[in-house]
């Protein structure tokens, strides 16, 4: 090992020099002040947790992105957080346990085993706001408006927002009656819009034809605002409850 190699950071791991650090700290304060003005309470989750707690309710992708290590005190497997969202959900459910809606925000470093792209970072600064205990259009709109104001504070221009309706997907999964493993596999194929793979899997699992047709249609329902009219027509058989 040369003297140069000794001081090289691992791939995807970055450090900020004074000018960059000062700029980022200014944005951090501005964003957290914004969240505070909206009634969001700051939490600081731990950087490391036991793996089973860290990955509760998460998918396989997060599992693969999580660094693991052994706790020298008891031999249990621990994980370095790759996403703070499950931690916020755990704090809301098991530490606070409020009946009224809870607004929480957070900012901290997360670590990924692999970068998103060929030259991407693995050590990222994540900021987020979560509204727990309220389901409906009002809470969706609040989070969306807060996100747009966050981007404005960070001076990010030319914003493009993709909107989806997760209730449609959940209802179709309920109709399909898939196992957890099958749901994860199908979700991965839907994310990649891999229609031939979706058709093959649904046929292999003997999913009812109406549900199969709608899951395939779901992979093609994207585009401008007129896609909503197509969705109402193609997914009409799902009934009420998703027509928001």
Labelled PLM ranges:
Residues 123-127, 163-171:
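Short, conserved phosphate-binding/catalytic loop or strand-edge motifs used
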Residues 7-17:
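Generic N-terminal amphipathic, Lys/Arg-enriched alpha-helix
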Residues 64-73, 177-203, 207-208:
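Acidic, His- and aromatic-enriched active-site or binding-groove loops in soluble protein domains
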Residues 46-78, 120, 124:
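Polyanion/phosphate-binding surface patch
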Residues 76-78, 155-160:
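Short active-site oxyanion
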Residues 2, 13, 20-38, 49-52, ...:
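Positively charged, Gly/Ser-enriched RNA/tRNA-binding surfaces
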Residues 1-8, 173, 178, 185:
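Charged, compositionally biased N-terminal leader segments and the immediate start
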């Amino acid at each position: 090992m040369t003297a140069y190699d000794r001081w090289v950071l691992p791939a995807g791991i970055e450090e900020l020099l004074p000018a960059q650090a000062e700029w980022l700290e200014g944005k951090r304060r501005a964003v957290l002040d914004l969240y505070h003005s909206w009634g969001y309470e700051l939490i600081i989750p731990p950087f490391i947790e036991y793996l089973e707690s860290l990955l509760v309710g998460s998918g396989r992708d997060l599992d693969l992105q999580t660094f693991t290590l052994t706790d020298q005190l008891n031999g249990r497997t621990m994980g370095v957080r790759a996403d703070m969202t499950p931690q916020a959900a755990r704090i809301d459910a098991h530490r606070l346990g409020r009946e009224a809606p809870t607004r929480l925000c957070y900012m901290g470093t997360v670590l990924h085993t692999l970068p998103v792209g060929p030259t991407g970072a693995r050590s990222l600064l994540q900021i987020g706001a979560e509204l727990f205990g309220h389901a409906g259009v009002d809470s969706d709109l609040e989070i969306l408006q807060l996100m747009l104001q966050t981007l404005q504070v960070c001076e990010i221009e030319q914003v493009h927002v993709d909107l989806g309706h997760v209730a449609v997907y959940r209802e179709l999964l309920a109709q399909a009656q898939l196992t957890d493993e099958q749901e994860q596999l199908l979700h991965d194929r839907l994310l990649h819009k891999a229609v031939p793979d979706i058709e093959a899997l649904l046929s292999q699992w003997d999913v009812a034809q109406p549900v199969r047709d709608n899951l395939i249609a779901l992979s093609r329902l994207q585009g401008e605002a007129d896609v909503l009219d197509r969705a109402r027509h193609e997914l009409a058989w799902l009934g009420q409850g998703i027509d928001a």
